[in-house]
Amino acid sequence: MKKLLTCIALGFATTSYAVTPLWMRDVQISPDGTEIAFCYKGDIYKVPAKGGTATQLTTQASYECTPIWSPDGKQIAFASDRNGNFDLFVMPSNGGTAQCLTTHSASEIPSAFTPDGKYVLFSASIQDPAQSALFPTSAMTELYKVPIGGGRTEQVLGTPAEMVCFDKSGKTFLYQDRKGFEDEWRKHHTSSVTRDIWMYDTQTGKHTNLTDHAGEDRNAVFTPDGQTVYFLSERNGGSFNVYSFPLNTPQSITAVTKFKTHPVRFLSTSSDNTLCYTYDGEIYTQRPGVNPQKVRIDLIRDDQEQISDLNSSKGATSATVSPDGKQIALTLRG
């Protein structure tokens, strides 16, 4: 008689329960500093900046990422691949129906709202300017803007300009460049291809290099008064940490955080000068002159697989008996 092997499939009962999420991405604090938006497992959430229960804002089966706040905090723009490629969407920050702003076949990733809240800037590889000397590849994007109500897109820059941050006047913005194909998650990279921080004058069209460092400098943000710049850097031989410099003397760089081992990522700031970033998979906030504070997050999810019985009479391999002889571990169906 054939032996019947019964394998209990891995999984948990389908119930709603609170978890403490790790490795959240695309974290951004709201303009007033009261809430934090983030991406977790392909959905957009927000949580009080002081910690608490996170609110899920998107529920599509698609992947949503890169949430950015409007200046008044009433809307959140984000990227979603619900239509195939990543398109730009905007929705009320308290949840609701999302409106699609772009429909190009390229992927569009939001970067910032203009200070008047009328446009969203985004990166996409749509059309290089005729005078461009860049190699024509989708990895080297251009910077565009689209009206918040949807409509015709307009090219802002024909060269890669990522992680845009405006000053309050809207006359200048910070951005990180992209010179080549290096993986953005690579650590301790030192070469001429690493990213630098630039400032762009929207009235004169002038680009000013604010960092000239062989390592990575990225994700720059203004303080509320526009006089100081915070940014992430791997300088001083360590992992990514937060640094700052006065805008009028960019060479006077000061370390703000001194984390070890893991990189700091996803830097943003609010109108009350609260910094927000991630470290070792968790979200932190930090006030000037105060130690970083970890944000406690409870997240309710109902997406675990249901337990089921899997019956099989053949195909089991690599079986081994537990030390007490009561259980057998085996490989079945890969």
Model regions and ranges:
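Mature N-terminal segment immediately following signal peptide/propeptide cleavage
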Residues: 19-49, 320
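Conserved beta-strand position repeated across blades of beta-propeller domains
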Residues: 28, 68, 112, 165, ...
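Glycine-rich phosphate/pyrophosphate-binding loop
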Residues: 310, 315-321
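A flexible loop/linker signature enriched in serine peptidases of the S9 family
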Residues: 19-21, 39-45, 53, 58-64, ...
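Positively charged n-region of N-terminal signal peptides that target proteins for export
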Residues: 1-4
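Hydrophobic h-region of N-terminal signal peptides that target proteins for export
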Residues: 9-17
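Membrane-embedded beta-strand positions in outer-membrane beta-barrel channels/transporters
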Residues: 26, 280-282, 318
